[in-house]
A protein has these predicted regions:
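GST-like domain detector, emphasizing the conserved glutathione-binding G-site
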Residues: 2-134, 223-224
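Short, flexible helix/strand-to-coil boundary loops that buttress conserved ligand/catalytic motifs
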Residues: 55, 74, 116, 151, ...
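GST-like fold's C-terminal all-alpha helical module
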Residues: 104-197
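C-terminal helix/juxtamembrane-tail motif
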Residues: 207-224
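Charged phosphate-binding loop/patch that engages nucleotide di/tri-phosphates or the phosphate backbone
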Residues: 194-197, 201-212
Length: 224
């Protein structure tokens, strides 16, 4: 979608980040072209004065839409859909359905991505801890258990087609699988396959992002 006289929204991102990928997939799903800026976390580019001026929380993704600054992927994704999408399929206007999409996105940040952050990103990536104890896996197992139940008898998390709920959650769980496979959760397994097949940008952005995450974290391709 092109708006005359307006520049493309700028997205600061890193491909290893599931939230960043969810925004790339959301934009792809509505046909929105972004001016993407890769932020190198290893070089601490997210902590430079220039970036901190944009986002003092120094998180990715961060959006600059012609001077309007927004961070947190769930906030960005809903904003982009409401402003640029041709319809409300990804974020339904119906109050009940929208509330369910919101609920599922809160589940992503409060369970799936939270588990990844607590078990892996903070202690191992940032603090140098060596390895993961099996006893720490309960957060992932519990998140899988809940998501498996949420998908009972359904193809998508909310409604009859994919929404922002599916996009956010699948970007997280496809990365979490590197830590804990979900082979024993049939609903999740089939849902991830549907997401890969149907969600625009999944093959272009999410699959390479998961692989890059694996390489950076030195995880074996056969999973842990």
């Amino acid at each position: 979608m092109t708006f005359i006289g307006m520049l493309r929204p700028i997205l600061y991102y890193t491909l290893t980040s599931p939230p960043s990928r969810s925004t790339l997939l959301s934009a792809a799903a509505i046909g929105l072209k972004l001016d993407i800026k890769d932020v190198n976390l290893a070089k601490r580019e997210h902590l430079t004065p220039e970036f901190l001026k944009i986002n003092p929380q120094h998180t990715l993704p961060t959006l600059n839409d012609n001077g309007f600054i927004l961070w947190d992927s769930h906030s960005i994704n809903t904003y982009l859909v409401r402003k640029y999408a041709k319809n409300d399929n990804l974020y339904p206007k119906d109050p009940a359905m929208r509330a369910k999409v919101d609920q599922c996105m809160y589940f992503d940040c409060g369970s799936l991505f939270y588990a990844m952050s607590v078990i892996f990103i903070r202690p191992i990536l940032y603090k140098g801890k060596k390895g993961i104890e099996e006893s720490e896996m309960y957060l992932i197992k519990d998140a899988y258990r809940v998501l498996e139940k949420m998908l009972d008898g359904k193809e998508w998390l909310v409604g009859d087609s994919y929404t922002l709920a599916d996009i956010s959650n699948v970007c997280s769980i496809s990365t979490l699988e590197l830590l804990k496979p979900f082979d024993t959760y049939p609903n999740i397994k089939e849902w991830v396959k549907r997401c890969e097949k149907n969600i625009p940008g999944y093959v272009e952005w999410n699959l390479p992002g998961v692989e890059k995450f694996r390489q950076i974290m030195k995880l074996p391709s056969s999973n842990l």
